[in-house]
A protein has these predicted regions:
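Cyclophilin-like peptidyl-prolyl cis-trans isomerases
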Residues: 19-270
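Bacterial N-terminal signal peptides
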Residues: 7-15
Length: 270
């Protein structure tokens, strides 16, 4: 359901409430004969409340971390499915990157990513999503709140093919804080042992033998290691990622066709 339809629903609700006391008796009569709301009605109300922020604080850099970690304890899910025109991508979220995991799940719960789109496609590198030039993402960011995320980088999570990570600004960001909305999935390319050794030396990184083997056999983008927080990995649907990555782009790496994505979270693989 798009934003305009939600707005119509809420406007109708507010108009009804604004009728005042003269209709109180009629409303009471209606209430007396009401049946219990159906599961569909309850689900719709929950989606409207989540999208419009009813009962949720507006997030800032001051309150976001505590709120998201607390929310994540009560709303923990381990998997996210990204539904696209080419098929589904299933991602596993890492439990030991709790803030980024909770943030992603919360934005899904608030309907930010339904729909959203992949807005940058860079061959042999990444596909990036979470923002667009359309009005809805800007409206939703205003409703949810503008904030960043303290980085949670871990040596064991690197940018091999299929890694899910958050984007970040490289300007005035010495602590490498993450965006709380923009994400990317790594496609990458195969990395030779010599090239990986150079990256280790340049970035003062020591890869495990397994990480070296994965970079050599399936590829990735190792120069992003130590720069962005990886918080999940594609476990199904990399062929779908490859189809999205093959989309023609303009000179700014924007796909020439809309690559819409809708997201759902769940506790097990469906």
């Amino acid at each position: 359901m798009n934003f305009s339809r939600f707005a119509i629903i809420v406007f109708a609700m507010l108009s009804f409430i604004g009728c005042g006391g003269e209709n109180t008796a009629i409303v009471d009569d209606v209430k007396a004969g009401e049946s219990e709301p159906s599961p569909v009605d309850s689900a719709l109300e929950a989606r409207v409340a989540a999208m419009l922020g009813i009962g949720y604080p507006k997030l800032t850099n001051e309150n976001a971390e505590d709120f998201l970690l607390d929310w994540g304890v009560e709303n923990n899910q381990d998997f996210v499915t990204m539904h696209t025109k080419h098929g589904d991508i299933v991602v596993e979220l890492f439990n030991d990157v709790p803030l980024h995991k909770s943030n992603f799940l919360y934005k899904i719960h608030r309907q930010y990513y339904s729909p959203s789109e992949f807005i940058r496609v860079l061959p042999d590198f990444v596909i990036q999503g979470g923002n667009s030039e359309e009005e809805k993402p800007q409206q939703m960011r205003y409703l949810i709140g503008t904030h960043s995320l303290p980085q949670e980088m871990k040596d064991k999570y690197v940018h091999t093919r299929g890694a899910l990570a958050m984007s970040r600004s490289y300007i005035n960001n010495p602590k490498k804080a993450s965006s709380s909305y923009d994400f990317y999935i790594v496609t990458g390319r195969k990395i030779s042992k010599h090239e990986l050794a150079s990256i280790e030396l340049e970035k003062n990184i020591r890869y495990t033998s397994q990480q070296k083997r994965r970079y050599n056999e399936i590829g990735g983008t190792p120069h992003l290691d130590g720069e962005h927080t990886v918080f999940g990995s594609v476990i199904q649907g990399m062929n779908v990622v490859d189809k999205l990555a093959a989309t023609p782009t303009d000179n700014s790496d924007w796909p020439v066709e809309r690559l819409e994505v809708n997201m759902t979270s769940h506790s097990r693989i469906e």
